[in-house]
């Protein structure tokens, strides 16, 4: 999974990236300090994996990972190449989802590119640039197929879809809120346009330390972000990038103590992972043994053979059965053999839909 972190200058974008990935990306109090996208790989926190690793005394524990890309800052006119617009638009097109950092804190020492803190305006600035870019893509498609569509029913059908999506965008709406017809062709066409405004989006409301304890409930800027996110089907999580930067230098016990002192249950990374998995419809299944315990990320609704294919294509091709037990049931019973004796280990076939927290042993023959 690849997430692109975006935002206007001086909203805390690179500070957040630095703290999440400890990659040391340059962060400064002036626009355009992020020219090329910085990439960092972050392990997905998963207590279940640690418990299983201890249970099996595994030689190796391998968590799932998320790739973060700190994308060049965007300003008004990016769709026309202003600022670092061309690089921004090219880089953002490659990610699975967008993490849009929005400034929701007041600080006279940190300049705002527009002179004041206004998350609604900031969100609209970036969203409009993405819309303009998408409209250009659709215009090019219309120009390419309009003439042929007069004599080709399939192209005529696609032209109707393209024009409908364009009208939706020109109304100031994001492509992800467009209701694509329940038709295989339409679904494929829409996906093929790879529209920026169709990408799932998570808003990271960057607040001051004082707003963390109540999750931004008393911050009017956060309320506005939540309102806008609800309208466009996006997720929101509240974070203090400055605190995350401080947490990045602490060990696990120190982090836990620091968060407790702040009255906060979860770190920003934990919140972001949860929001990402929720938005993208992802779950994790686990493989476990003495050699290795590992978490594998899949889409909800994935069937056993396709889950096996995440490990190796041979597993999917030669799939026979999947021996499945919930991780907690396995731990509670002390061993896989004991769980088998109690009848709580399932032998599942090709139609089994994998569940979050399943520990699976695949049987295959190639």
Residues of each region from the PLM?
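C-terminal-of-GTPase-core extension/linker across diverse P-loop GTPases
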Residues: 2-6, 17, 146-353, 360, ...
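Amphipathic alpha-helical transducer elements in NTP-driven molecular machines
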Residues: 32, 46-49, 62-68, 82-95, ...
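Conserved G1/Walker A P-loop phosphate-binding module
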Residues: 1-111, 139-140
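Short capping/connector residues at structural and topological boundaries
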Residues: 6, 32, 37-40, 47-49, ...
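Short, well-ordered loop/turn sites that connect or cap secondary structure elements
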Residues: 92, 354-355
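Glycine-rich, flexible loop/turn motifs
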Residues: 23-31, 38-40, 48-51, 80, ...
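Short, intrinsically disordered, mixed-charge
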Residues: 22, 54, 90, 128, ...
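Conserved Switch II/interswitch segment of TRAFAC-class P-loop GTPases
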Residues: 40-45, 72-82, 93-155, 168-182, ...
């Amino acid at each position: 999974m690849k997430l692109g972190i975006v935002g206007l200058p001086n909203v805390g974008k690179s500070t957040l990236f630095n703290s999440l990935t400890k990659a040391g990306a340059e962060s400064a109090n002036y626009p355009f300090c992020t020219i090329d996208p910085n990439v960092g790989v972050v392990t997905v926190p998963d207590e279940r994996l640690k418990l299983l690793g201890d249970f099996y005394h595994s030689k190796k524990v391998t968590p799932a990972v998320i790739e973060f890309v700190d994308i060049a800052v965007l300003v008004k006119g990016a769709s026309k190449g202003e600022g670092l617009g061309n690089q921004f638009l090219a880089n953002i097109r490659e990610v699975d989802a967008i993490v849009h950092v929005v400034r929701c804190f007041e600080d006279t020492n940190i300049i705002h590119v527009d002179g004041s803190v206004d998350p609604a305006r900031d969100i609209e600035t970036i969203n409009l640039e993405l819309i303009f870019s998408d409209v250009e893509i659709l215009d090019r498609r219309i120009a390419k197929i309009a003439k042929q569509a007069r004599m080709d029913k399939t192209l005529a059908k696609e032209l109707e879809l393209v024009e409908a999506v364009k009208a939706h965008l020109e109304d100031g709406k994001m492509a992800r809120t467009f209701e694509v017809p329940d038709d295989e062709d339409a679904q494929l066409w829409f996906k093929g346009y790879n529209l920026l405004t169709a990408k799932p989006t998570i808003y990271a409301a960057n607040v001051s330390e004082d707003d963390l304890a109540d999750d931004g409930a008393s911050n009017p800027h956060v309320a506005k972000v939540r309102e806008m996110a609800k309208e466009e089907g996006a997720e929101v999580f509240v974070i203090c990038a400055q605190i995350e930067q401080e947490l990045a230098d602490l060990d696990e016990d120190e982090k836990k103590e620091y968060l407790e002192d702040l009255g906060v249950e979860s770190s920003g990374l934990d919140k972001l992972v949860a929001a990402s998995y929720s938005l993208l419809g992802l779950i994790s299944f686990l493989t476990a043994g003495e050699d290795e315990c590992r978490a594998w990320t899949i889409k909800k609704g994935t069937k056993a053979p396709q889950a096996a294919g995440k490990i190796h294509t041979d597993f999917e091709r030669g799939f026979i059965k999947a021996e499945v037990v919930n991780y907690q049931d396995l731990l509670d019973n002390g061993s896989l053999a004991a769980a088998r004796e109690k009848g709580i280990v399932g032998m599942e076939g090709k139609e089994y839909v994998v569940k979050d927290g399943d520990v699976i042993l695949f049987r295959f023959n190639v």
